[in-house]
Amino acid sequence: GDVYKRQVRNIFIEDCKIDSCRNGIYFKSNLDRGGYFENLNMRRIEADVCLWGVINFRTNYHGYRGGNHPTLFRNICIEDVTCNRVDSVALMANGLPEAKLYNITLRNIKVKQAPKAIQMDNVVNLTLDNVEVNGKRITSAEQTD
């Protein structure tokens, strides 16, 4: 849901097809929401066109009202994802200093066309394994731990 303040853990998602969307796989939160998402596994996701990103983590989603309840994202593995076109950044993970993302694995990800490949901030223990955007292998991301 859009506003989720509880715990989500031990989830497995597979074999999904997405025609056209803003974000293919989208995790969003802010400092008002709290809770956690952990031990999530996703695989075999096919997307055609994603306007804002095929994979997008955002812990600074608008609507913040001054709370101090960061959502914890940890132990997330996303693999075997293909996307034909992204109109913004293909892979984004934007944590905050007080709401970092932990243990994120992206494996066997292929985005055929995107103006920017990757943008990562405040991610601890990011693994990029066989990730390709615009025909180029992505092995690291500039990030702030």
Regions found by a protein language model. Give the residues of each.
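Mature catalytic domains of secreted/periplasmic carbohydrate-active enzymes
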Residues: F27-S29, F57-H62
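Short, T/G/N/S-enriched strand-turn elements that build extracellular solenoid repeat scaffolds
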Residues: R6, D15, G66-T71, A93-G95, ...
